[in-house]
């Protein structure tokens, strides 16, 4: 699959008949939404976990030196905590550009803190996209992150801001926090 998924996502029509749609955010949407929303509240999806396995040559890296950004990967016992944003479908025009580098809009069930649930959409980069980097040791991911900068800024800022946002929400994520620890160690070693 091409790294540019805008055309594929425009064909996602499952929610076209709705005035509003829930969007699940688990990465940069936690610290930099950058779009209009009607409501925002904590949510989670089951069976998925965060991983820095997606390459970024359009935001946090370049084609010659891609950064690493989050995607979700399936894991049966996992729960990914994040934020649900209630948006108007027109917002997807903006989001499809932001998430064009290999991310597909997929329908998932979102669980809320009050026990209720709703169908919604989440952007997930799958292994068949051209920007996929895949699994690597946390220290190697941190080294790549530390060396990468793109139009949206240093890749390290993405990791640090995400870790801060997760802590502010009371969420723990060993993958994100492990990469953050390796980044700080690299900075101390200087």
For the regions a language model picked out, list residue spans one by one.
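A glycine-rich, hydrophobic/aromatic-adjacent loop/helix-cap motif
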Residues: 1-190
């Amino acid at each position: 699959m091409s790294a540019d998924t805008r055309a594929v996502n425009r064909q996602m029509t499952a929610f076209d008949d709705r005035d509003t749609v829930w969007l699940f955010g688990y990465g940069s949407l936690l610290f930099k939404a950058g779009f209009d929303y009607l409501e925002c509240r904590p949510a989670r999806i089951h069976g998925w976990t965060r991983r820095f396995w997606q390459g970024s040559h359009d935001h946090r890296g370049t084609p010659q030196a891609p950064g690493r950004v989050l995607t979700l990967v399936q894991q049966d016992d996992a729960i990914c905590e994040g934020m649900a944003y209630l948006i108007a479908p027109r917002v997807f025009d903006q989001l499809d550009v932001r998430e064009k580098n290999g991310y597909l809009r997929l329908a998932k069930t979102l669980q809320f803190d009050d026990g209720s649930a709703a169908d919604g959409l989440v952007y997930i980069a799958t292994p068949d996209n051209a920007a996929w980097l895949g699994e690597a040791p946390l220290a190697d991911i941190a080294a790549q992150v530390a060396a990468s900068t793109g139009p949206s800024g240093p890749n390290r800022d993405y990791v640090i801001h995400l870790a801060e946002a997760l802590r502010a929400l009371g969420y723990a994520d060993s993958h994100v926090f492990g990469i953050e620890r390796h980044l700080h160690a690299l900075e101390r070693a200087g």
